[in-house]
C-alpha cells in the first residue's frame, strides 16, 4: 500500500474519483461559473454552479429523469439524445437565471470525441449558454438518436430476436426505437414551449 516514508495519501475525494483538485483550484482562482455535466449508469445530471466559501452555489440544475416525468421521454435516460436534452434544459434554466457564459467542468471523465459529455455541452450551447469547447461537428448526426434508429432498423430486418432483446425497454415503454428521432423532436419542442420550467 505505502511506498516508503515520503508517501503522501491523496485527498479522499480524489481517491474516490470524485474531484480533480488541480482543475477545481483553477476554477476557484478565476472565479468562473462552471457547467458541470455528470454521467451515471442510468442518468445524466447537469448543474451550473459557482464557488462560495461555504459550498458551491447551484444556479441551475437538470436531471434526465425530468425528461420522463415532465416531458414524456420514452427513450433511455442516459443515451446521447437524453444527454443533449438534459444539457438543453440546464442551459435554458441557466440563461433564465442570468448566466451568459460558463466553463465546462467534466471532472475526471476522459474526453472522447462524440461522447455523451459533449452532447450535454452542445445542448447547453444550443439553449443560448456560451461554453467554450472545440469542434462538435461529429455530434450533429448523433444528438437526435438517428444512429440508434438506424441500428434498430438494421436489427429489426436481420435478427428480430436480438432486436426484441436489446430494445425491450423501448418497446415496453411504447416507443418504436426506429422512430426515436421523431420522438426526440417532439420532446425538444415541448421543452422549448415550456421554457425549461
From Swiss-Prot:
NCBIfam families: PRK08569.1 (NF006342)
Keyword terms of this UniProt record: Ribonucleoprotein, Ribosomal protein, RNA-binding, rRNA-binding
SUPFAM superfamilies associated with the record: Translational machinery components
Coiled-coil region list: none
Alphabetized Pfam families for the sequence: Ribosomal_L5e (PF17144)
InterPro entries: Rbsml_uL18_euk
GO molecular function, one term: 5S rRNA binding
The family this protein is said to belong to: Belongs to the universal ribosomal protein uL18 family.
Protein name: Large ribosomal subunit protein uL18
Entry function: This is one of the proteins that bind and probably mediate the attachment of the 5S RNA into the large ribosomal subunit, where it forms part of the central protuberance.
GO CC aspect terms: cytosolic large ribosomal subunit
CDD domains (alphabetical): Ribosomal_L18_L5e (cd00432)
Superkingdom of the organism of origin: Archaea
Alphabetical list of PANTHER family matching this protein: LARGE RIBOSOMAL SUBUNIT PROTEIN UL18, RIBOSOMAL PROTEIN L5-RELATED
A single GO BP: translation
Subunit structure: Part of the 50S ribosomal subunit. Contacts the 5S and 23S rRNAs.
